[in-house]
Amino acid sequence: MEINLKDIDLFIEENKENILRDIGRLVAVPSIEGEPEENAPFGAEPKKALELGLKIAEEMGLSTRNCENYIGYAELPGEDKEKYIATVTHLDVVPVGEG
């Protein structure tokens, strides 16, 4: 499958409101690393951000996996199970402060 940049631009334009809504949902979580808790190795807020990120992915139709609240991932199976595209991201943030 060939990826056409015009298709990507069209997808973004057609889904702009949902994209902005989901970014807003994610940045509303103050996901600063806290004290480890049971089932929350980086604290309660990073766990909330991880759960929300996976929920958003599920809302988009992707299958997700939470790996003991350390990391999670979402995937959309393609035709060729041997090939896939991956991206690395994080949902935790640093404390609020000046620049």
What are these regions (language model features)?
Residues E2-G99:
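Acidic/His- and Gly-rich active-site-bordering loop/insert found
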